[in-house]
Swiss-Prot record:
5-phospho-alpha-D-ribose 1-diphosphate binds at R79, R104, D131, P132, M133, L134, A135, T136, G137, G138, S139, D200. Belongs to the UPRTase family. SUPFAM superfamilies: PRTase-like. It comes from the Bacteria. This is Uracil phosphoribosyltransferase. GO terms for molecular function: GTP binding; magnesium ion binding; uracil phosphoribosyltransferase activity. Its EC number is 2.4.2.9. It comes from Latilactobacillus sakei subsp. sakei (strain 23K) (Lactobacillus sakei subsp. sakei). The keyword GTP-binding applies.
């Protein structure tokens, strides 16, 4: 079964409170969402593989550490996932960026894929799939399906807020994909939105309704 982890770092929790607040405007919401994403990926990458390498310092040779595992990529689920990309790239500027476009039918709550654009070497990269909300889990499951179909084998799902229903659904569909969240909420309301949540993340990120 996939691991589910809530990252309880004080800075992450403080910033999550800011974006939950309905009075937080678009500019601050966007900035803080990226800050949370950066902090989350910092925590999540603690287990990246390392190797010894010899470097020449101004004073002489030294044996130091460098990354040795798979190259990294971030894959936002459009459109709201775009609001976490800059935070990840701030920490890992060499990461490539793929995109998966999804929209949710407001009546059936089912996701529909409309766009996929990925690095050509996706099978050689560790992917961070980013989306602010994990509600029913439908979009995340479909995104992971699409990535696996195209050769991806190493993925982690990174969300700001999750509902238990979505966590359970993703774990059952993809037990090999670990899930990381800044917050775990009570559940879904009758419309399928996370409660108490933070509202519509896409609208709050981009100033739309």
């Amino acid at each position: 079964m996939a691991k589910f982890t809530v990252l309880n770092h004080p800075l992450i929790q403080h910033k999550l409170t800011i974006i939950r607040n309905k009075n937080t405007g678009t500019k601050v919401f966007r900035e803080v969402a990226n800050e949370i994403a950066e902090l989350m990926v910092y925590e999540i990458t603690r287990d990246l593989a390392m190797e010894d390498v010899e470097v020449e310092t101004p004073m002489g040779p030294a044996i130091e550490k460098q990354l040795s595992g798979k190259k990294l990529a971030v894959v936002p689920i459009l459109r709201a996932g775009l609001g976490m990309v800059d935070g990840v790239l701030e920490l890992i500027p060499a990461a490539k960026v793929g995109h998966i476009g999804m929209y949710r039918d407001e009546k059936t709550l089912q996701p529909h894929e409309y766009f996929v654009k990925l690095p050509t070497d996706i099978d050689q990269r560790q992917l961070f799939i980013v989306d602010p909300m994990l509600a029913t889990g439908g979009s995340a499951i479909m995104a992971i399906d699409a990535l696996k179909k195209r050769g991806a084998t190493s993925m982690r799902l990174v969300v700001l807020v999750a509902a238990p229903e979505g966590v359970k659904a993703v774990q059952e569909a993809h037990p090999d994909v670990d899930i990381y969240a800044a917050g775990l909420d009570d559940g879904l309301n009758e419309e399928g939105y996370i409660y108490p949540g933070l509202g519509d993340a896409g609208d709050r990120l981009f100033g739309t309704k």
